[in-house]
Swiss-Prot record:
It holds the Pfam family Homeodomain. Belongs to the Abd-B homeobox family. Its main location: nucleus. It comes from the Eukaryota. CDD domains: homeodomain. It is found in: Nucleus. GO terms for molecular function: DNA binding; DNA-binding transcription factor activity, RNA polymerase II-specific. Residues 211-222 have a biased composition (Low complexity). InterPro entries: DUF3528, HD, HD_metazoa, Homeobox_CS, Homeodomain-like_sf. It comes from Mus musculus. Residues 223-235 have a biased composition (Gly residues). GO terms for cellular component: nucleoplasm. Residues 171-189 have a biased composition (Pro residues). This is Homeobox protein Hox-D11.
């Protein structure tokens, strides 16, 4: 006896008191090339194989396939199977329609989750960069949603927006992303800022970039020359006080250091003559493209610097017991 819910075969002798469920013999006998030398309590497979359990029309009235169902009950062969398939056609069509509807609904839900609706602005969902200095920003509308979906990045500027939650949960201020540099302000022309200052000194080479040198052209000489004979021209202090066009945040004029060539020539002349006469001063100013006053002030500061160096050198040698 073959039980569909069991994984093994049971001999009919075990159920002698029960009536046999199979009232008719097997309609499809199969033979196998191997011999069935099985145990006595195991029934051979060919005795229980391919029983026509559900092919009677009386047991399955809803299948009503007409001639197909009758043919299946009589023969059970290929002809009956082919005729019975006509009774399943409505059920197959309904199942196929239901599967197609489910697939369409799933696809629509997936598209709705991925792409934003047409009514909403895509820049709300995707953090579009703000336009800088009136530059044209990205296009708005449903057409930009698809491009923003692949090109939009999160607030870190590198990873997609799905990683923003990690930056929000991280301690410290949130990463603001690469910030665009502000446009540099137009530089104020020096002539407009220094209109109130009179041009120092007299003549000689007005085209020099160092035409408006300060009393301290050298880095150390300016700081060390205070209180001496080279304080600077008296007209500059009055110009700084009365110059209304000078910017308030700038208390002194911009430093204009000398070039290496100018410093080398001035140092060479200072090595031979600590005090320079007017003729030599005019000659240097023409050769170095400087004004007469610039050369004069440089020598004043250089003398103060040499005086301070001599004083420091003397203190070092007298304070050190080894000398």
């Amino acid at each position: 006896m073959y039980l569909p819910g069991c994984a093994y075969y049971v001999a009919p002798s075990d159920f002698a008191s029960k009536p046999s469920f199979l009232s008719q013999p097997s309609s499809c006998q199969m033979t196998f090339p191997y011999s069935s030398n099985l145990a006595p309590h195991v029934q051979p497979v060919r005795e229980v194989a391919f029983r026509d359990y559900g092919l009677e029309r009386a047991k399955w009235p809803y299948r009503g396939g007409g001639g197909g169902g009758a043919g299946g009950g009589g023969g059970g062969g290929p002809g009956g199977g082919g005729g019975g398939s006509g009774g399943y056609a409505p059920y197959y069509a309904a199942a196929a329609a239901a599967a197609a509807a489910a697939a369409a609904a799933e696809e629509a839900a997936m598209q709705r989750d991925l792409l934003p609706p047409a009514g909403r602005r895509p820049d709300v969902l995707f953090k579009a960069p703000e336009p800088v200095c009136g530059a044209p920003g990205p296009p708005h509308g449903p057409a930009a949603a698809a491009s923003n979906f692949y090109s939009a990045v999160g607030r870190n500027g590198i990873l997609p927006q799905g990683f923003d939650q990690f930056y929000e949960a991280a301690p410290g201020p949130p990463f603001a992303g690469p910030q665009p540099q502000p446009a540099p302000a137009p530089p104020q022309p020096e002539g407009a800022a220094d209109k109130g200052d009179p041009k120092p000194g007299a003549g000689g080479g007005g085209g020099s970039p160092c035409a408006k040198a300060t009393p301290g052209p050298e880095p150390k000489g300016a700081a060390e020359g205070g209180g001496g004979e080279g304080e600077g021209p008296p007209g500059e202090a009055g110009a700084e006080k009365s110059g209304g066009t000078v910017a308030p945040q700038r208390s002194r004029k911009k430093r204009c250091p000398y070039t290496k060539y100018q410093i080398r020539e001035l140092e060479r002349e200072f090595f031979f003559n600590v005090y320079i006469n007017k003729e030599k001063r005019l000659q240097l100013s023409r050769m170095l493209n400087l004004t007469d006053r610039q050369v004069k002030i440089w020598f004043q500061n250089r003398r103060m610097k040499e005086k301070k160096l001599n004083r420091d050198r003397l203190q070092y040698f007298t304070g050190n017991p080894l000398f």
